[in-house]
Amino acid sequence: MTLAVVTERTTGTEPNHMVEFREGLELLKNEYPDKAVLKLRQAFESDKRNPYYISFLGLSMARAEQNWEQALDLCETAVQLKRKEIKFHLNLIEVYALAGWREKALRKLDNASKLFGDDARLKRFRAKVVERRAPRSAFLWTQAFLKSRTRQIAAPPVEARRQMKS
């Protein structure tokens, strides 16, 4: 779907900030976070207390600018404003995952599971967070293994160390 089609669909009787928000969501969905940030920021500037604008602006900033601190602040604010909206929790969890804070993302998933029960979206997010984590732990295991082998090869025998001390 092109931006022209999205603009055509959303213009009409809706206020401009709602049009900007819908276009921003469409851009975010279609993997254009840089463009989405601009649209979502315009919507946010029109209504700074709208938790939907706040949450999705935070998510788009995380994806486009890797501005983790501000993205987390926005997403956490949206969750505080409307705690019962699962999408705000999912956006916050995604920002934690994008920032590389897997443990925090998993804790937030656990908390959201307590609040929303057995939701399929939470299960999908958990699978993504755990999946992203696997290569990292494999890398760390390999790194630790190589480091221990290097020490064994480089370290002088015990007898030689004793002689060096004397």
Predicted segment positions?
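TPR-adjacent "capping" and linker segments in tetratricopeptide-repeat scaffold/adaptor proteins
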Residues: T2-V19, R136
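Conserved structural position within tetratricopeptide repeats
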Residues: T11, Q42-E45, E76-Q80, D110-K114
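Alpha-helical segment of the N-proximal tetratricopeptide repeat
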Residues: T13-S46
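Structural signature of tandem alpha-helical TPR/SEL1-like repeats
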Residues: N30-K39, A64-T77, A99-N111, R136-W141
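Canonical tetratricopeptide repeat
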Residues: F56-L57, N91, F125
